[in-house]
A protein has these predicted regions:
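Transmembrane signal-anchor hairpin modules in multi-pass inner-membrane enzymes, especially those
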Residues: 1-62, 67, 93-98, 149-158, ...
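Aromatic-anchored transmembrane helix interface
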Residues: 19-27, 42-58, 65-90, 101-112, ...
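Hydrophobic, aromatic-rich transmembrane alpha-helices
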Residues: 22-36, 141-153, 326-346
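Alpha-helical transmembrane segments of multi-pass inner-membrane proteins
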Residues: 83, 87-124, 131-196, 222-223
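Transmembrane alpha-helices of multi-pass inner-membrane enzymes
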Residues: 146, 338, 353-404
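A membrane-periplasm/extracellular boundary helix in multi-pass inner-membrane enzymes
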Residues: 168, 172-173, 193-249, 267
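Long extracytoplasmic/lumenal interhelical loops at the membrane interface
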Residues: 252-256, 263, 271, 275-324
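Hydrophobic transmembrane alpha-helices and their immediate junctions
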Residues: 309-311, 322-363
Length: 404
């Protein structure tokens, strides 16, 4: 229910989601489980860094004389991220398999979101050009995680073609990042299957070696992407980005063209690296600099003005640093590190179903923390991170005996 309601906006001081309001309403009923979850060292470390991030945001807002409205929006975003995380920790501390219900809810929410967008924004040209991102990925990605959980152990050859098809179709219909993370997960699934069948189930070094192999295999996939993007088969946006690249075979240049907001984020961080610019910062000189850089890249096709009321950063990691200072950056670097660590521990100790969900999450987490806006941090990350923590805690019990 909560995961499904995360797509329904409620406008108060800022934009809440109905799911967040339900979390706050249910807190008293789950307080006992939440307090129990706080005994977990992983939870305490994340909460401690979250409090440090919140404190840094308060200091940043005071230093930058941020308006009360914007300060409440920025502080509220951090507060809701952490309270939602703690709620799901309480929900999963007894049984991490409860996460399957959350995934079902997230998939249902994706269907609901697609229906609402089509009903009220069906004529929006931007949505039509990016069908996958706006109408499909919201329900398809959690559905893929559920499918992997159910079938990877017993029928892995069903998971492989589905993941490859997902990646190809997503790229064809504008979901390049979503297709990429699922292709990486699928490559890892193939590697993991060979490891399980040829190493008697010993997966101790599989995370490190698997990621290295995936990185190598991504090279020919990137070359194929360039060829098809240049031909126009992957849509206008992909073709324009490839055509603008001085060297289309340079993946860093192509990535920066797709996520050009990172450039202005680095300028903003350079100006105020310790405390940042404050909640919902929107400095006029940085906006003008961003538009100037866009004209240098896109020429006449560059935007003439910015309609957002916040500096366009498009990165959870860099955004936390730009608006809240260095402590926000440290928080999300720690999250990425623990995601790899906890996923690796699941590979060693967990059941194959739980491992499958972790494999889906690793590239998903990394991509969205690095290259997606703050919505990921508030609406998707809390439930997923809580799952990784308590799936590990479940299989680390003395009497736990995972069935591969």
């Amino acid at each position: 229910m909560i995961a499904a309601c995360m797509v329904i906006p409620v406008n108060l001081i800022g934009t809440f989601r109905l799911g967040e309001l339900l979390v706050l309403a249910l807190y008293p009923f789950y307080m006992k489980q939440i307090l129990k979850a706080l005994r977990n060292r992983e939870v305490m470390a994340i909460v401690g860094l979250g409090l440090l991030w919140l404190t840094s945001q308060v200091l940043s807002d005071l230093y930058n004389a941020t308006t009360m409205k914007n300060s409440l929006r920025g502080l509220g975003s951090i507060f809701l991220t952490m309270t939602t995380f703690l709620f799901f920790c309480g929900l999963y501390c007894r049984n991490p398999r409860n996460h399957l219900g959350t995934l079902l809810g997230a998939s249902a929410g994706g269907v609901l979101s697609a229906g609402l967008l089509y009903r009220f924004e069906g004529n929006n040209a931007g949505y039509a050009e990016n069908i996958w991102d706006f109408y499909v990925s919201g329900w398809a990605h959690p559905a893929f995680a559920i499918f992997a959980f159910l079938f990877y152990r017993s029928h892995p050859w069903l998971v492989f073609p589905l993941g490859i098809a997902y990646g190809i179709v997503a790229n064809m219909y504008g979901g390049r990042s979503d297709g990429l993370v699922v292709l990486i997960s699928t490559l890892f699934f193939v590697y993991l299957w060979f490891q399980v069948t040829h190493s008697r189930g010993d997966l101790r070094y599989s995370m490190r070696s698997g990621l290295m192999i995936c990185a190598v295999l991504l090279v020919p996939l990137f070359l194929l992407y360039v060829v098809y993007a240049q031909s126009g088969a992957l849509g206008k946006a992909a073709k324009m980005q490839i055509d603008l690249a001085k060297n289309p075979y340079n993946p860093v240049e192509v990535l920066l063209l797709a996520r050009n907001e990172s450039v202005i984020a680095l300028d903003a961080i350079y100006e105020k690296p310790i405390l940042g610019h404050g909640s919902w910062a929107n400095p006029g000189h940085l906006r003008r600099l961003y538009l100037l850089k866009m004209r240098e890249i896109y020429g006449a096709a560059a935007p003439k003005k910015l309609i957002q009321d916040i500096l366009p950063v498009h990165s959870v990691l860099l955004g936390a640093w730009v608006f809240g200072g260095l402590a926000g950056f440290i928080f999300w670097v720690y999250v990425i590190y623990r995601t790899f660590y906890l996923s690796n521990q699941l590979l060693i100790n967990g059941s194959m179903g739980m491992i499958a969900i972790a494999v889906v999450y690793v590239p998903y987490f990394c991509w969205h923390v690095l290259f997606s806006p703050n919505a990921f941090a508030r609406f998707s990350w809390p439930m997923s991170m809580a799952f990784l923590i308590f799936a590990n805690a479940f299989f680390m019990r003395p009497n736990a005996a995972p069935k591969r």
